[in-house]
Amino acid sequence: MDNLSSEEIQQRAHQITDESLESTRRILGLAIESQDAGIKTITMLDEQKEQLNRIEEGLDQINKDMRETEKTLTELNKCCGLCVCPCNRTKNFESGKAYKTTWGDGGENSPCNVVSKQPGPVTNGQLQQPTTGAASGGYIKRITNDAREDEMEENLTQVGSILGNLKDMALNIGNEIDAQNPQIKRITDKADTNRDRIDIANARAKKLIDS
């Protein structure tokens, strides 16, 4: 640099400023893409949560319907005058360990009544802006002190804000996944229990028809 003329030094400064400006533009573009991906992920998790809730409600309704079906089968046995030996009576399905583990006893501590910790929703891309900002004096050391450096400062300020948003989104995504995993297992257990209950009811109905 000592061998460069003042004009060459100025040209070099402008070249570095142009390169730095393009770098901040690329960084900002990548940050915006990451934020958009995070928003889409949160939206998809929210939609998945609604679907899981509907599935679980459907399984709960099947469970209730099966309870009524079993009562009907018991009444039909009585109406048909079938005498069942006490040792051959069908055991109440809801007294079984598998049922109690899945549905509990209907009290406040039953699996169905346990509410997992839910993160605060982020909808329509509206994210809280972080309170942290640029360090005192700005992000860059000004050399040319022109509009390019103004844009660089603005770009880096936006990047800092987006990084704060990404941190919040990562926490929300992690919390939502942690909340949904137990529900997915609960749904699987309920589906398995309902299947077993339906199989037993079908066997009772077939036996009743064949009698």
Curated annotation (Swiss-Prot):
Membrane topology note: Peripheral membrane protein; Lipid-anchor
Domain of life: Eukaryota
Signal peptide: none
In-chain residues carrying the UniProt-annotated modification Phosphoserine: 5-6, 20, 23, 34, 110, 161
Keyword Cell membrane on entry: yes
Subcellular location: Cell membrane; Synapse, Synaptosome
Keyword presence, Disulfide bond: no
Name by which UniProt lists this protein: Synaptosomal-associated protein 23
